[in-house]
Amino acid sequence: MATIKVTQTKSSIGRLPKHKATLRGLGLRKINHTVELEDTPCVRGMINKVYYMVKVEE
């Protein structure tokens, strides 16, 4: 399966609780924290939910 790198680019302070939970689900904690995840529909859906706070590299 292909992998993607997801980097948090903005703070989660003041965001919707669901969006904070989505970031935690992706494994992101701090600004500029990067995680490598499998490219699955579930992960893509989570990224789409918080697209304004993350950067994705394929």
Curated annotation (Swiss-Prot):
It comes from the Bacteria. SUPFAM superfamilies: Ribosomal protein L30p/L7e (SSF55129). InterPro entries: Ribo_uL30_ferredoxin-like_sf, Ribosomal_uL30_bac-type, Ribosomal_uL30_CS, Ribosomal_uL30_ferredoxin-like. Gene3D superfamilies: Ribosomal protein L30, ferredoxin-like fold domain. Keywords: Ribonucleoprotein, Ribosomal protein. PROSITE patterns: RIBOSOMAL_L30. CDD domains: Ribosomal_L30. Transmembrane segments: none annotated. One of its GO terms (biological process) is translation. GO terms for cellular component: cytosolic large ribosomal subunit. GO terms for molecular function: structural constituent of ribosome. Part of the 50S ribosomal subunit. Belongs to the universal ribosomal protein uL30 family. HAMAP family: Ribosomal_uL30_B. This is Large ribosomal subunit protein uL30. It comes from Vibrio cholerae serotype O1 (strain ATCC 39315 / El Tor Inaba N16961). The gene is rpmD.
